[in-house]
A protein has these predicted regions:
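Short mixed-charge
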Residues: 177-203
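Acidic, metal/cofactor-coordinating or nucleic-acid-engaging core segments within structured domains
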Residues: 46-53, 232, 236-295
Length: 345
């Protein structure tokens, strides 16, 4: 029997209560975070920090207060892609934002090229700071015990995480230790490199017990013009490596490695965010990670879903197809229930 465990943001919140969408939105809107991250832009790449600040302030000023961080990143990607991609046509929404933000009066292509990277670094820093405040070891143990329980029921378990954090990574380390004699999980990053572990898609595809991060991770880093995806063992190493890559090669390849679309560049970064995830899924290696996730979901005899918000259409369509075509197979959804929530019966 094959099992699939799908983990969304709600699965991390018990470990780190602050890791909510509203928290990440506040951090992305916080101007101090932007001034801090912009100040880190290396002078060697010769872009105007003043122009970057002006562009970002203009974009943020035109987004509604209720807009969450993924929508903000979507707008950032499209506006910056518009200018990085020689001003190809856009939908009216983005054109209006550009006009109202007065973007046509300045800012080089290089300025626009770096902003999507900076936005994701703010998100990554916010997540890392929350995690550094301490992960509950008891909860990590419980998550490990739950995964161990699934493995006891099946020798073919696929874990699909849509989270950017490294909560599951720490659990995986425990699962693969001597304390857990169950079969080890493979996340595909098995090729040792001087700067971390490189993705081996063949091993990931063949792994019976696997962990897949189709939306990326704050531990990821693109190297060598985006041709290699590296997994670092710590956030500090991953972050330092990303900034080194930025200094060595500009415009930043890890934000412009995606192909030119009809309206914009697909910003294929270390984390896949925004409301344009489906577009990024066309690009390697995220397309292969997504294919692995889809394949494992469809081949599963049962699916357990924890903390997933059902906001990603590229995943919802797969689950919908599964329930319609795999009659009699179970889909178990685990969610938080407040004490005063109404319960039938």
């Amino acid at each position: 029997m094959k099992l699939a465990l799908i983990i969304g943001a709600g699965a991390s919140i018990p470990f780190v209560p602050s890791l909510t969408s509203s928290f990440l939105t506040k951090e992305l809107r916080r101007w101090d975070n932007w001034t801090g991250i912009i100040s880190r832009v290396p002078s060697a790449i010769n872009v105007s920090k003043r122009d970057i600040r002006r562009i970002v302030r203009g974009i943020l000023s035109q987004t509604r207060k209720e807009t969450n961080f993924e929508h903000i990143i979507e707008i950032i990607d499209k506006v910056c892609g518009y200018y990085t991609n020689n001003k190809k046509s856009l939908f009216n929404k983005e054109v209006n934002i550009i006009r109202r933000s007065n973007k046509d009066k300045g800012g080089s292509r290089n300025c626009y090229a770096i902003i999507p990277f900076l936005a994701r670094e703010i998100i990554a820093d916010a997540i890392s700071s929350s995690l550094k405040n301490g992960l509950d070891s008891e909860l990590l143990t419980k998550q490990g015990e739950f995964i161990k329980f699934l493995v006891s029921k099946s020798n073919n378990v696929s874990i699909i995480s849509f989270n950017y954090d490294y909560v599951l990574d720490r659990t995986q380390n425990a699962i693969n230790s001597k304390d857990y004699p169950s079969p080890s999980f493979c996340n595909g990053f098995t090729k040792e490199a001087s700067d971390g572990y490189e993705l081996d898609l063949e091993k990931l595809t063949k792994a019976s017990n696997s962990i897949v991060f189709p939306h990326g991770s704050i531990l990821f880093n693109h190297k060598y013009n985006g041709r290699r995806l590296i997994y670092n063992s710590s956030y500090d190493e991953a972050e330092a490596d990303r900034w080194r890559s930025l200094k060595e090669s500009y415009p930043p390849k890890q934000t412009s490695v995606g192909q030119h679309g009809v309206n914009t560049i697909d910003f294929n970064t270390f984390i896949v965010s925004g409301q344009t995830k489906e577009t990024t899924m066309k690009n390697a290696p995220f397309n292969r990670l997504y294919q692995k996730a889809v394949d494992d979901i469809y081949k599963s005899d049962a699916i357990v879903i924890i903390g997933y918000s059902f906001h990603d259409e590229h995943i919802n369509s797969v689950l919908s197809y599964y329930t319609e075509t795999r009659k009699g197979h179970k889909v178990i959804v685990v969610d938080k229930q407040e004490i005063n929530d109404a319960v039938d019966g």
